[in-house]
Curated annotation (Swiss-Prot):
This protein's GO CC annotations: Golgi apparatus; lysosomal membrane; lysosome; plasma membrane
UniProt protein name: Integral membrane protein 2C
Function: Negative regulator of amyloid-beta peptide production. May inhibit the processing of APP by blocking its access to alpha- and beta-secretase. Binding to the beta-secretase-cleaved APP C-terminal fragment is negligible, suggesting that ITM2C is a poor gamma-secretase cleavage inhibitor. May play a role in TNF-induced cell death and neuronal differentiation.
Domain annotation BRICHOS: ranges: 138-232
Source species of the chain: Sus scrofa
Primary site of residence: membrane
Amino acid sequence: MVKISFQPAVAGIKGDKADKASASASAPAPAPAAEILLTPAREERPPHHRYKKGSSVGGVCYLSMGMVVLLMGLVFASVYIYRYFFLAQLARDNFFHCGVLYEDSLSSQARTRMELEEDVKIYLEENYERINVPVPQFGGGDPADIIHDFQRGLTAYHDISLDKCYVIELNTTIVLPPRNFWELLMNVKRGTYLPQTYIIQEEMVVTEHVSDKEALGSFIYHLCNGKDTYRLRRRATRRRINKRGAKNCNAIRHFENTFVVETLICGVV
């Protein structure tokens, strides 16, 4: 608080004091000096801005949602590219149209040079192979569809001429696993051609009718569903099949290795 006082003016001439002495004696006493009290003004502070917590939390939420949407877009784009480009290329690499030259040493005639063609589909993830043998140009076997299921350990032959299915345990000494067979065919596709190869023969006998095809697995089930299906047993000892015995046998020539296999199915019903 500041105190300000106002004093009355003092006469500047001494003579006036004497003249006014008498007058001042009779005059009333002068009024006290006027005082004015001034209160210092309060300092004005800038208003304090309070930030709301809700606005910052909302900004974080919007940012998080934006990141989630961006990540989802990247995931869907990756799935699209994988499905329509990578899988398509992989499918093309797993389908093969193959041909192999071999000497037919099983023929009664002199050894002749033969060619065998087949379409191969290899399913690496499902671990099975599917082979289609078209009608041979120069005889030597029936057209057939063959499935080698390495998960079930089974092989199924669908003789297209008879429209019948035959199932037997998978012979892993003859049939290459899907990965090895795929590598072999990829080398052939790249130009590393198979040399002229040879043919071996295996003989099988029909044993019993199969009624429960679902127990054979989904791959063989789809191949043999709606067809008469029979079990086969591999003949342990080789025997020479004459012309009379050959009438009761059907031959399917195929290859899943570096050589050709002739599968004889005998006792066909």
